[in-house]
A protein has these predicted regions:
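Sec-dependent signal peptide recognition
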Residues: 1-7
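Hydrophobic h-region of N-terminal signal peptides that target proteins for export
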Residues: 7-16
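Non-catalytic accessory regions flanking glycosidase/transglycosidase catalytic cores in CAZymes
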Residues: 15-239, 244-253, 277-278, 282-503
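Active-site His/acidic residue clusters
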Residues: 257-273
Length: 503
């Protein structure tokens, strides 16, 4: 039925004057779309680890304690890189508590989230999990209460091949070969007063510089992520400038974090958060360029290593946010911003993976997939390897003293497949938008594949046994191409990926 509707809508529009235009040009590239944009995050928080990806003794778990049903859902999600162990948790975490025989690991009071930590899941369990799901591991060191020695010893434990104390401890714990962990975070949100071991920018930069030096002396091949500001109510720009200027020769990324909300119950305002996301990226990109003003600058990129919708569930609910259809639309908004800035945003990690502000929810009998799960999968799959500039002219609405187009667009290109992907979020609550899609270079063929999320109830959610209603539809159509362009209607409050072929 969906396919028939798509044909009828497209055909009916041919006689109309389109309200919007999108121009694509395969020669106008932005940069490579890094696979690490499709990452995720696993923190010791609520039921993210225990009862989420790991549940010893469960009939749904394997002999190592990993939930196999969850693992299959995670594999299908396409997680390219997984950040661990936090988050706020990392600022009070002693990684040595989480290695060795499980029955001998200490139970600790966990200060960040006011819980008890059994430490039955630690470094080896995490790294084996990333191997099982095919993801790069990304470890965040304790930049709050931790020391430089803690950080370098952790690198030695995971990456050293010679017979050293910590490498031999790894062997004793059942792993002979190094894990070769490439990505390391130099602490989490250290600018935030809520953080254990909170520091000002100067003190953080001194710590991070010494940690980077010591960690790279253990393994010179690692990539390091500085803790960018997440405290947007303070001088976040000044923090990032100070950190970048101090660490410009020692880091590979600086982090950004953003959580958005729809407390005002205003869809168009909610989906207009892209204004701020673009601003955060572009302002930080400017600070990077300023720090690189000297000769032979080291490349530095942005790791957007925490992002999501989060405002309903708090600590009392263990952050178990129930997502709806409008939140699924917001996933497209975030990814469109990341793709539009693919030259500088080279990593992104949705927070988080299971149960805690997550696309996957579990109980002891099984799981269900939240509506946000599906756009995450498709943005990772339905894409080219290069981001394109997409020129957009569309009806607008006023938000934060600026005119914002109702359609939010990004585009990617695969030269190998002659495929152009056009990602379009229609932010309008009520208006379908007829759009002429114009190709500027090469010949546009009439073959179009369509992936789309559209549902009448913006607040529709999923639950156990009922997670098949707010799901994407796929179809193909034969477009009426005229002058290297065609018209397509993007339904109100919808997210669409069009796959075009350009010869």
């Amino acid at each position: 039925m969906h396919r028939i509707l798509v044909f009828l809508a497209s055909g009916a529009l041919l006689a109309q004057t389109p309200a919007a235009r999108i121009k694509i040009d395969i020669d106008r590239t932005i940069g490579e779309v890094d696979p690490l944009l499709f990452g995720n995050f696993a923190e010791h928080l609520g039921r993210m680890i225990y009862g989420g990806i790991y549940e010893e003794g469960s009939p749904l778990s394997d002999k190592d304690g990993y939930r196999t049903d969850v693992m299959e859902a995670v594999k299908k999600l396409g997680v390219s890189i997984l950040r661990y162990p936090g988050g706020n948790f990392s600022s009070g975490y002693n990684w040595t508590d989480g290695i060795g025989p499980k029955d001998q690991r200490p139970v600790r009071v966990e200060l960040a989230w006011n819980d008890l930590e059994s430490n039955r899941f630690g470094t080896d369990e995490f790294l084996r999990y990333t191997e099982r799901i095919g993801a790069e591991p990304y470890i965040c060191i304790n930049g709050g209460l931790g020391t430089v020695d803690d950080a370098r010893h952790w690198v030695e434990y995971t990456n050293e091949s010679r017979h050293t104390y910590w490498a031999d401890q790894r062997r004793k714990n059942g792993r002979d070969e190094p894990y070769h962990v490439k990505y390391w975070g130099l602490g989490n949100e250290i600018d935030g007063p809520w953080q254990l071991g909170h520091k000002n920018a100067e003190d953080y930069a001194k710590f991070a510089l010494e940690a980077a030096k010591a960690m790279r002396l253990v393994d010179a091949s690692i990539k390091l992520v500085a803790s960018g500001s997440s405290n947007y109510g303070a001088d976040w720009i000044g923090w990032n400038r100070t950190v970048l200027n101090a660490l410009r020769n020692d880091i590979d990324y600086i982090s950004l974090h953003t959580y958005i909300n729809n407390r005002d119950n205003d869809l168009e305002k909610f989906l207009g958060w892209s204004q701020r996301i673009d601003y955060y990226i572009e302002t930080t990109a400017g600070a990077i360029l300023s720090a690189q003003s000297g000769p032979n600058p080291r490349p530095i990129y942005i790791a957007y290593d925490e992002w999501n919708v989060w405002y309903r569930a708090g600590n009392n609910d263990h952050l178990e946010e129930r997502y709806n259809f409008e939140d699924a639309l917001a996933m497209g908004m975030f990814f469109n911003s990341f793709v539009r800035h693919a030259d500088v945003v080279k990593m992104a990690n949705l927070a988080q993976l299971v149960n805690v502000i997550a696309p996957i929810m579990t109980n002891k009998q099984g799981l269900f997939l939240q509506p946000i799960y599906f756009p995450i999968v498709e943005y990772g799959k339905q894409r080219g390897n290069v981001a394109l500039h997409a020129w957009v002219a569309a009806p607008t609405y006023s938000l934060n003293h600026h005119d914002l187009p109702y359609i939010d667009v990004s585009s990617t290109y695969s030269a190998k497949d002659h495929a152009v992907y056009v990602n379009v979020l229609n932010r309008s609550k009520s208006q379908d938008i007829a759009t002429r899609i114009e190709n500027q270079e090469g010949t546009l063929t009439p073959d179009v594949a369509v992936w789309q999320m559209n549902y009448p109830d913006l607040k529709a959610t999923h639950t156990f046994g009922d997670d098949k209603k707010v799901v994407p539809k796929t179809s193909t159509l034969t477009a009426t191409v005229s002058r290297n362009s065609f018209v397509y209607t993007f339904p109100a409050h919808s997210l669409t990926i069009l796959r075009l072929r350009v010869e």
